[in-house]
Amino acid sequence: MGQKVNPIGFRLGVVKGWESNWYGGKTFADKLVEDEQIRKYVLARIPKGGISKIVIERTIKRVTLTINTARPGVVIGKGGAEVDKIKEELKKITGKDVQINIFEIKRPEMEALLVGESIAQQLKARISYRRAMKQAIAGTMRVGALGIKIKLSGRLGGAEMARTDQYKEGRIPLHTLRADIDYAVSEALTVYGKIGIKVWIFKGEVYGKRDLSPNVGNAASGASSSSNNDNASPNQGGPRRKRGGEGNRKKSNK
């Protein structure tokens, strides 16, 4: 089952958190569609912002966006001008006050979506797909990932018949729920047609409790920038907790 299902959806509530945090009730469908409109607008407005994830929270009077980006300066704009424009447009869409929190991604090579988008840009520039895949894998493993797999589908290299090719390094334990695996899908529109890109990145195994939304609600009101702790390496195969209270037994005094 782990081989077929979306790795992020499979781990929701275990090591992964939701990207839409609110209660909709009877208006659930309308709010879900509105969330999709918000994300599409922000990504279209800042296509080169290096945005990996947008988490949306809702209250009665306010909509809060938490944007994880590798290029916070591009998202904020000069003197915060870009963020202010985005707030005005989103207020028209939602009809509520909008708050935007911005967190910087220190290691974009560990974000599956950013890796996929990077490969897509190289394919559009007619760089060899094998070279693009190998460079992405080397860069991700160099910054501390335990495994990465990249799969491309389409008319690779301009071939007459579409096919699938993939490269993998390290391990990707898709059946292990405590495994922190990032997954993303991207597309590259080339002169030969559309090429699909799938990326899996294994960051390590998570033991004990974990904050599923570490960056949500931590920033001050308005646009702010901070470091992103979400892609900090978890316990990468470290020792398990001792059972039976072995670590809590007091040493007897002789």
Swiss-Prot record:
Which PROSITE patterns is this protein grouped with? KH_TYPE_2, RIBOSOMAL_S3
Would you tell me the protein name for this molecule?
Answer: Small ribosomal subunit protein uS3
InterPro entries found in the cross-reference section: KH_dom, KH_dom-like_a/b, KH_dom_type_2, KH_sf_prok-type, Ribosomal_S3_C_sf, Ribosomal_uS3_bac-typ, Ribosomal_uS3_C, Ribosomal_uS3_CS
Q: How does it assemble?
A: Part of the 30S ribosomal subunit. Forms a tight complex with proteins S10 and S14.
Quick one: a GO biological-process term for this protein? Answer: translation
**Region (Disordered) residue spans:** 215-254
Native species: Cytophaga hutchinsonii (strain ATCC 33406 / DSM 1761 / CIP 103989 / NBRC 15051 / NCIMB 9469 / D465)
This protein's source sits in the domain of life called Bacteria
- From start to end residue, where is composition biased (Basic and acidic residues)? 244-254
Gene coding for it:
rpsC
Upper classification of the organism: Bacteria, Pseudomonadati, Bacteroidota, Cytophagia, Cytophagales
Task: List the GO terms this entry assigns under cellular component, sorted alphabetically.
Answer: cytosolic small ribosomal subunit
Q: Which family does it belong to?
A: Belongs to the universal ribosomal protein uS3 family.
Q: Which segments constitute the KH type-2 domain?
A: 38-106
GO molecular-function term, one example from the UniProt record: mRNA binding
- Residues spanning the signal sequence: none
| Entry annotated with the keyword Ribosomal protein | yes
Q: Which UniProt keywords apply?
A: Ribonucleoprotein, Ribosomal protein, RNA-binding, rRNA-binding
Q: Low complexity bias: where?
A: 215-238
Signal: is it a keyword of this entry? no
Report the function annotation for this chain. Answer: Binds the lower part of the 30S subunit head. Binds mRNA in the 70S ribosome, positioning it for translation.
SMART domains found in the cross-reference section: KH
